[in-house]
Amino acid sequence: MPHSSLHPSIPRPRGHRAKKAAFVLLSTCLAALWELGEPADHILRWLVLHLASEQLGLLFKGLCSLAEEIRHVHSRYQGSYWRAFRACLGCPIRCGVLLLLSCYCYTFLPNTAGLPFAWIVALLGLSQALNILLDLQGLAPAVVSTVCEQGNFNVAHGLAWSYYIGYLRLILPGLQARIHTYNQRHNNTVRGTGVHKLYILLPLDCGVPDDLSVADPNIRFLHELPKQSADRAGIKGRVYTNSIYEILENGKPVGTCVLEYATPLQTLFAMSQDSRAGFSREERLEQAKLFCQTLGDILADVPESQYCRLIVYLDAAEGSSFSLSQEILKHLKQEEKEEVTVGTMGSSGVLESSTLDKEPQLLISGMDQPLPLRTDVF
């Protein structure tokens, strides 16, 4: 299930609108300079000089960062000063080229301000020092979020992969066999192909009670599936269990399914309650959305996705009339409709192919003489 269909509030991955806006800004500035009537060579000279100043300032900033990283060269860079240098200043060839280009621009291009080269370098160093001390060039939250998403540095990314690799990938392949074993013992309690899945609840507010009946009294625990055991990380016969719940409507059972919360959301909630984690409520909501997005993207590319269904919801956004049991019933009915549609399309395709695959048959009349095509001769 793609993340865009999980819940309307889950954000899409960031695109390239910032670069498009930069292109519009570039065009606007070029048009403004053209209207001002400045000579093209004069504009180009100042542009190159300004870019050289910015790059030289970034080199100064990188050197200040290098002073801190040298303290951690053994713990962070395995004792390699070269790796610490590259981490702060990037490619050394690029740094050398930019430094030579900056020196060339300041030496050979006309200096309209009349300042010596040493003065310009000192002013650049002064400005970068003030930027670092006063944090004048701190990254905006949107920039930090973009960097974390593009580099997969978010807490939610690690939690989603851990949840899939350490849990879902282990239990989902054998889930239908365990449900079949359970049905043999309990007179087919879990009926219908649509319910032979693991329904995973994903509340975006990370409210994960240990008892589902606390979240909604119309969700009633029924039984446990047969246990599954596996050797994991030195633990012999680690046991995995799943629970079957009955969904009630007007006091009567109307559905049965294997149901549970995604436990990493409970971790996010606990982090937001612990001041040592430095995790605000807004950050928790953002990470919960990214967790659902990442988990949906992971499951979209693996065969185990056919054995589970994600139910994403947000109580506050849905209003006070929101009912978790009704939300689960909606997904159960939708799952059945999808499977009926797929089954109907498959059967019609089989019928068509079987009809077309038949050998052609000759229809031979029992009359001695052939009949004309016209009917007015009789």
Curated annotation (Swiss-Prot):
Q: Where is the signal peptide?
A: none
User: How does the record classify its membrane topology?
Assistant: Multi-pass membrane protein
Location comes to: Endoplasmic reticulum membrane; Cytoplasm, Perinuclear region; Endoplasmic reticulum-Golgi intermediate compartment membrane; Golgi apparatus membrane
Site positions for Not phosphorylated, renumbered to this chain?
357
Q: What does this protein do?
A: Facilitator of innate immune signaling that acts as a sensor of cytosolic DNA from bacteria and viruses and promotes low production of type I interferon (IFN-alpha and IFN-beta). Compared to other mammals, STING1-dependent type I interferon induction is strongly reduced in bats, suggesting that the cGAS-STING pathway promotes a limited inflammatory response. Innate immune response is triggered in response to non-CpG double-stranded DNA from viruses and bacteria delivered to the cytoplasm.
The free-text domain note is: In absence of cGAMP, the transmembrane and cytoplasmic regions interact to form an integrated, domain-swapped dimeric assembly. In absence of cyclic nucleotide (c-di-GMP or cGAMP), the protein is autoinhibited by an intramolecular interaction between the cyclic dinucleotide-binding domain (CBD) and the C-terminal tail (CTT). Following cGAMP-binding, the cyclic dinucleotide-binding domain (CBD) is closed, leading to a 180 degrees rotation of the CBD domain relative to the transmembrane domain.
Please give the name of this protein: Stimulator of interferon genes protein
What is the originating organism of this protein? Rhinolophus ferrumequinum (Greater horseshoe bat)
Its gene name is STING1
